[in-house]
């Protein structure tokens, strides 16, 4: 039996360059991803048959073949058909449909856990290759920390960690944004601005502002980091979901050094220089927005990906 901790992720930077030139239908992206200390907890127990069973504390999570944790186990079973099944228990703390990679981080945890449980001896590179088959965010969730992600998100470069920086998360429980809708709507509205050739895409990458952010991360310089956050998907999500736009404004009004929507939303994150200030900001936002449907968390930037839970 293995217990694992699976961190959520936020996007500090999300630039849509254009369509991938391989004809896959995906977008070419420049992202800076950050793991945070809001974590799901997974427990993997071996079975004596070939079945994969998933259980979750959140009844809204599908526990069948639609679940990414299930898909991760099934993928490993395809590669290692002599292995038995597994019972997967997910204690869900990361909200659903939130732009926080909750499903992807569960899949990454299953890859790590089954590598140990089944004594597969997979290298980090082999785990990353499997992760990329499951979804664009799964390779990052495996690695965690702070990383530059190119392509669909699978081309990862580790960056200096941002330990000590506090992150406040806010999400309306009843609100979710479908990631495919966000990207498809962006394509419909902004396709005319897409970089069409390799040279155009490289130029867009160079001019998109990520270099300033990367330098700020390297130097742990919070002011230019906060000033150079970017999420292109805000252009389509915020007009459609005014609650998300208002939450971002309230974080800034409460004293956050920066605030932005994460991924395709609807989660909004804010940055604070300390945990004490993070809790003060959370309390101010709670007073300004007393809606019981709004969940708020204070967490830290996390320097790692999937970890074994030590008792």
Curated annotation (Swiss-Prot):
Pfam families: GHMP_kinases_C, GHMP_kinases_N. It comes from the Bacteria. The keyword Zinc does not apply. GO terms for biological process: isopentenyl diphosphate biosynthetic process, methylerythritol 4-phosphate pathway; terpenoid biosynthetic process. The keyword Transferase applies. Belongs to the GHMP kinase family. IspE subfamily. This is 4-diphosphocytidyl-2-C-methyl-D-erythritol kinase.
